[in-house]
């Protein structure tokens, strides 16, 4: 399945574009309709469809740092998301 929807207080849409040939295939799967809905959309392999992503967004990258370790890189695109990231820096996290 290329698109999975998980209902909840905020709907979560998981879009896996790995098997798509390119950005044009997004029309066939209803990508614009999903992006217009209220909810959170997570796009796996988003670099394959970079020209169709919203200009304002959060980009997350999972990086392999060892056999059993990963790190998460979060990049803000747009003022709203820069403010969200700035707010996250004030939160204490446990390791």
Protein language model regions, located:
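N-terminal phosphate/diphosphate-binding loop that engages ATP/GTP or pyrophosphate donors
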Residues: 1-13, 18-30
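Short phosphate-coordinating micro-motif centered on Lys-Gly-acidic
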Residues: 21-26, 32-95
């Amino acid at each position: 399945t290329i698109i999975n929807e998980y209902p909840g207080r905020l709907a979560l849409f998981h879009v896996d574009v790995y098997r798509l040939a390119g950005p044009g295939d997004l029309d066939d799967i209803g990508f614009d309709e999903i992006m217009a809905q209220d909810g959170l959309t997570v796009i796996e392999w988003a670099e394959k469809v970079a020209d169709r992503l919203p200009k304002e967004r959060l980009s997350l990258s999972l990086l392999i740092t060892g056999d059993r370790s990963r790190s998460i890189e979060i990049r803000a695109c747009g003022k709203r998301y820069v403010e969200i990231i700035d707010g996250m820096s004030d939160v204490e996290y446990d390791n």
